[in-house]
Curated annotation (Swiss-Prot):
Organism: Rhodopseudomonas palustris (strain BisB18)
HAMAP family referenced in this protein's UniProt entry, alphabetically: Ribosomal_uL29
Alphabetized InterPro entries for the sequence: Ribosomal_protein_uL29, Ribosomal_uL29, Ribosomal_uL29_CS, Ribosomal_uL29_sf
Entry's Gene Ontology molecular function annotations: structural constituent of ribosome
Family: Belongs to the universal ribosomal protein uL29 family.
A GO BP annotation: translation
Protein name as annotated: Large ribosomal subunit protein uL29
Pfam families reported in the protein's UniProt record: Ribosomal_L29
Keyword Transport: no
Origin superkingdom: Bacteria
Gene Ontology CC entries for this record: cytosolic large ribosomal subunit
Keywords tagged on the record: Ribonucleoprotein, Ribosomal protein
Length: 68
């Protein structure tokens, strides 16, 4: 999965955001295992996945707060 853009994230429904976070967490888990066993080639993907999760959660919180 490539780096997610904020416009794409804002267009997602809350359920889609939850699914995307779950998928990224699974990917991050697998990437950590690959790094531990020395099989990880694209080390920057770990950082991208972590930041994508944070980006999705931040936008979701902003949208939740805006509704109040």
């Amino acid at each position: 999965m490539a780096e997610m853009k904020t416009a794409d994230i804002r267009a997602m429904s809350p359920d889609q955001k939850d699914d995307a976070v779950a998928e990224l967490k699974k990917e991050r888990f697998n990437l950590r295992f690959q790094r531990a066993t020395g099989q990880l080639e694209n080390t920057s993907r770990l950082r991208e996945a972590r930041r994508d999760i944070a980006r999705i959660k931040t936008i979701a919180a902003q949208q939740r707060d805006a509704k109040k």
